[in-house]
Amino acid sequence: EERYEVLKAEMASEFHRAAADGELVLKHGVADTLKLIRDKNIPCALATSTRKEVVTMELTNLGVIDYFDKLICGDMVERSKPAPDIFLKACGELGVAPENAFAVEDSYNGVRAAHSAGMKVVMIPDLVQPDAEMREKALIIFDNMDGFKEYIMKLVTA
């Protein structure tokens, strides 16, 4: 466990260095999807376990901070994912009932948290492919953000 904590701290340090140096890049399709959401006046929050100070810097460097109506960060809730707190707070801040909200997640704990909050979970796997539990908890799974963007376009034109 001590070795795990050391590795976790080293990873966090490298991540924050990359963020500060402007080395982080958006995944393909994210900016276009966020633009569509904004253009269609769909309320949008970011619910992340990362501290607000770091998130604000990252989103500013990436040029997407203005796409989010609310930022709900790990230092703003008592319990982190897989507890539903961060998603419930995001829905509350947006004034949207969880059952009427989508949560887009790439992690198992994020999917668990959003599902526990009663949200419609969209999984876009990153490092780990979905297992049976994730397939059960997610409303839909896309290979990439383009799939989710197309899904939104169908919903808003239906």
Stretch-by-stretch model annotation:
Residues 45-46, 123:
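Hydrophobic beta-strand core positions in alpha/beta domains
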